[in-house]
Amino acid sequence: MLTGKSIYHVNQNLGKAFEPGQLNGYFNDMTQKVLMGDKNLDEKGIPFLEHSDGSHVQMPTMIFQYGLGAYDLWVIRKEIDYFNKAKRCADWAIDHQEDNGAWSVFFYIYPNAPYSAMPQGEAVSLLVRIYKETKDEKYLSAAEKAIKFMLTDVRDGGVCKCNDFELILLEYTHLPLVMNGWIFALFGLYDYFLLTGEYEEEFKESVNSLEKALVHFDCGYWSMYDEEGKIASPFYHNLHIAQMKALYMVTKKKIFNEYAERFERYQKNRLNELRAFAKKAMQKLTD
């Protein structure tokens, strides 16, 4: 899928109710996942992915993003049905969280590397919002377990690379570094800090590490999906722009705004877009 467009890849611009420094709307707009995705819900209202053979699988990332989109719709529209949708997703997160605090995301394709920092962060963002509204400690407890696992080094079975100089949050523990997954994980860390005041230094350390790594995600005319040269689809390029804007609003680091503006310039240049499309097509053929 060269254009990166599907019900699972709806545009995720800057969140419609996002406010930096406030545990309110989410950083990215996930609302279309709710508004367009109600046909793929089970009897409990939880999203599922349908395979070509008709079988269903429930993916943590899909569920957490659906919950965040529903929460945003509740913030915007004040319709309790949307809050209930978000809460059901948070309850699913608790019911399916493993003892180590993780959710197995890649169990079906990478059984030896099933964990990811990205859904850990997204789950935390959902759980702390539901905790804020309900004051039910089970949501905060699950979020704390998720953060602790997310900050466990990959050498110890976790999903980050950490040492005295950097803190990198890994979407894949066995594949090249992916930027969007790192940032989604960062968003969860920031949300947990907003609620509890904890892990501020870890957030700052990872932001600084990301700042140094940004050069690896810019090929000069388009953004890169990963640090080893896989070019971003239009969907991921647009997502990178929104994430850069959100990070700038949160951190006030000018470099994130500079990259947001740079990526937007790339996006508006038709020649750049065609060049990126051609390279993406070639990479798809050789994958």
Where do the model's predicted regions map?
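Extreme N-terminal leader/anchor segments
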Residues: 1-21
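Long, well-ordered core segments of solenoidal/helical folds
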Residues: 2, 19-53, 83-102, 140-162, ...
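Carbohydrate-binding/catalytic loop surfaces
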Residues: 19, 29-55, 101-122, 160-181, ...
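Long, hydrophobic/aromatic-enriched structural stretches that serve as scaffold segments
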Residues: 57-118
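Well-ordered alpha-helical segments within folded domains of soluble proteins
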Residues: 59-74, 115-132, 176-193, 233-249
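Structural helix-adjacent loops and short alpha-helical linkers that scaffold large soluble proteins
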Residues: 73-87, 130-145, 190-204, 247-261
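Hydrophobic alpha-helical segments and helix pairs
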Residues: 94, 99-149
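Hydrophobic, well-structured mid-protein blocks that either form specific transmembrane helices
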Residues: 130-180
